[in-house]
């Protein structure tokens, strides 16, 4: 095996460096709202939200969730900005008739939820066991199982590629169409077993804070995550797009190199969500690093 001029740290070193780096979201907030504070939440458009974001959320509420929110008039330029924003989040089909861009993929292009998996081996084995045994249980609920898979898939997308609204909208769409068939007691138990309760609460909180859902529509959470609104707006202002091949290490002569910008972007994303799913974030971190260096020619 050729020696190289670049020393690759072990996966353990990478993980320890990652875990030792402080981040404002790695510690739980000092105060959480009580459920009673959120039972009457309506569409919460903050005073600092610009017209493009307001129309983004209102069009989704009207086209996906059957609401009747008023759409504000905008210039052709702003409609094009909105359409490109929707395209970035995989929701272009709902905005194409309002701007000069072709219809692009939306919810129907998301992979089937049954293909979801977790990077942590123990948690993934638990997910497989749930998926295998649930259809044969006495109180079997396939709708609950499907919804769990949607949450797992959404979580994996957020951790790997950043927050994209196509997945958040899919959660809301399933709740509105099949929410009455979901066994929420069973779902809560599964989320706890998979250590996904906090990040599932974050995903549901984004529905409440931006898309007009009420707390009582989402029985598997008891309060709204305070940071949900800011994280949702950040995803619109500065969407993260991380492609798998951006993270690959390349062996060029005697040197090994990689896309450091993509690596920093990925680790910032991991740190942002570490508090909400620490075990899965750590496993994703190690998995991505090991998968990237495995492509180096020995």
Identify the function of each model-found stretch.
Residues 15, 46-298:
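Conserved NTP-donor binding/palm subdomain of two-metal-ion nucleotidyltransferases/polymerases, i.e.
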């Amino acid at each position: 095996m050729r020696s190289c001029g670049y020393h690759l740290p072990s996966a353990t070193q990478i993980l320890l460096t990652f875990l030792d780096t402080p981040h404002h979201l790695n510690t739980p907030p000092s105060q959480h709202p009580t459920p009673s504070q959120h039972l009457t939440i309506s569409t919460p458009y903050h005073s600092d939200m610009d017209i493009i974001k307001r129309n983004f959320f209102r069009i989704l509420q009207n086209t996906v969730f059957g609401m009747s929110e008023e759409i504000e008039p905008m210039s052709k330029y702003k409609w094009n900005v909105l359409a490109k924003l929707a395209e970035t989040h995989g929701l272009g089909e709902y905005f194409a008739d309002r701007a000069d861009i072709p219809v692009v993929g939306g919810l129907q292009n998301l992979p089937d939820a049954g293909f979801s998996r977790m990077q942590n081996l123990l948690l993934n084995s638990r997910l497989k066991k749930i998926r295998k045994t649930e259809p044969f249980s006495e109180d079997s609920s396939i709708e609950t199982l499907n919804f769990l898979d949607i949450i797992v898939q959404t979580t994996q997308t957020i951790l790997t590629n950043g927050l994209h609204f196509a997945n958040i909208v899919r959660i809301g769409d399933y709740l509105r169409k099949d929410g009455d068939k979901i066994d929420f007691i069973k779902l809560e138990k599964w989320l706890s077993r998979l250590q996904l309760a906090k990040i599932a609460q974050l995903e549901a909180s984004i529905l409440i804070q931006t898309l007009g859902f009420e707390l009582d529509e989402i029985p598997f959470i008891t309060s709204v995550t305070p940071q949900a609104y800011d994280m949702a707006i950040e995803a619109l202002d500065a969407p993260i797009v991380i492609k798998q091949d951006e993270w690959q290490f390349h062996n060029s002569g005697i040197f090994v190199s990689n896309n450091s910008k993509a690596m920093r972007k990925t680790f910032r994303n991991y740190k942002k969500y570490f508090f909400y799913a620490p075990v899965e974030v750590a496993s994703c971190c190690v998995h991505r690093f090991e998968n990237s260096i495995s492509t180096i020619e020995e």
